[in-house]
């Protein structure tokens, strides 16, 4: 059974975006990170948690603990839609392979077009294929 697919179906059915899904090595702990344009509330987390608990019971998904939360201020960017939605925000990106001896970049996300992500950094503009991103997240504003 594809547990992540099941979680995605439940979360999107409730009107939320599944940002990330993590399980412990033995699958005993499940972490679900949700988001919505207006921001996630504690009640939203409870609603998703209750619905997932019911679905897991019906589908016989074996687990010990379920955690549902917002992705936080340093939200990870994983999908192409994330790179469009957060254009204009400051991001931190780690690439799989270096560009000019550099794998880590911090800059303002200019967006994504035709599979290429563009950043404006202190050292100038940089562009790289979306598929080359190992990890990306928002830089919190304080």
UniProtKB/Swiss-Prot annotation:
Organism field: Aromatoleum aromaticum (strain DSM 19018 / LMG 30748 / EbN1)
Assigned keywords, A-Z: Cytoplasm, Ribosome biogenesis
Job of this protein: Required for maturation of 30S ribosomal subunits.
Family assignment from sequence similarity: Belongs to the RimP family.
Cited PANTHER family: RIBOSOME MATURATION FACTOR RIMP
Protein name: Ribosome maturation factor RimP
Classification via HAMAP family: RimP
GO terms of biological process kind: ribosomal small subunit assembly; translation
Subcellular location: Cytoplasm
InterPro entries per UniProt: Ribosome_maturation_RimP (IPR003728), RimP_C (IPR028998), RimP_C_sf (IPR036847), RimP_N (IPR028989), RimP_N_sf (IPR035956)
Pfam families assigned: DUF150_C, RimP_N
Record GO cellular component, one term: cytosol
Lineage: Bacteria, Pseudomonadati, Pseudomonadota, Betaproteobacteria, Rhodocyclales
Recorded superkingdom: Bacteria
């Amino acid at each position: 059974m594809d547990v992540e697919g099941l979680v995605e179906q439940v979360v999107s059915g409730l009107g939320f975006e599944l940002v990330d899904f993590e399980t412990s090595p033995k699958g005993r702990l499940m972490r679900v990170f949700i988001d919505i344009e207006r921001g996630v509330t504690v009640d939203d987390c409870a609603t998703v948690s209750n619905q997932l608990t019911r679905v897991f019971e019906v589908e016989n998904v074996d687990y010990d603990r379920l955690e549902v939360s917002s992705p936080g201020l340093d939200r990870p960017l994983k999908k192409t839609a994330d790179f469009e939605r957060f254009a204009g925000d400051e991001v931190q990106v780690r690439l799989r392979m270096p560009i000019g001896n550099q794998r880590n970049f911090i800059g303002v996300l200019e967006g994504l077009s035709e599979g290429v992500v563009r950043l404006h950094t202190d050292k100038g503009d940089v562009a790289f294929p979306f598929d080359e991103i190992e990890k990306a997240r928002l830089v919190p504003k304080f």
